[in-house]
Amino acid sequence: MSDQEKISHTVIGRVVSDKMDKTITVLIERKVAHSLYKKYVRRFTKLHAHDENNECRMGDIVAIAGTRPLSKTKAWKLVDILERAR
């Protein structure tokens, strides 16, 4: 691969944990239509992402991208911090 890694899939979420070294937990929210009632309900997914410089804090809004598996549970990496927590 060249100097730039290929960025596959990018999602935006909120950091809910930064206690691990070089790893953050990101909460992804999506809205799905209920099959029977057709009302939109919120569904959540927690993903572990690689934060090389430990720069994220809880509450930050971040963009993460899929990458090769880095550990048993970590296959995402931090792309950008979109908004800092207040």
Swiss-Prot record:
Pfam families: Ribosomal_S17. GO terms for cellular component: cytosolic small ribosomal subunit. It comes from the Bacteria. CDD domains: Ribosomal_uS17. Disulfide bonds: none annotated. GO terms for molecular function: rRNA binding; structural constituent of ribosome. GO terms for biological process: translation. Keywords: Ribonucleoprotein, Ribosomal protein, RNA-binding, rRNA-binding. InterPro entries: NA-bd_OB-fold, Ribosomal_uS17, Ribosomal_uS17_bact/chlr. PANTHER family: 40S RIBOSOMAL PROTEIN S11 FAMILY MEMBER, SMALL RIBOSOMAL SUBUNIT PROTEIN US17M. Part of the 30S ribosomal subunit. Belongs to the universal ribosomal protein uS17 family. This is Small ribosomal subunit protein uS17. The lineage of its organism: Bacteria, Pseudomonadati, Pseudomonadota, Gammaproteobacteria, Chromatiales. The gene is rpsQ.
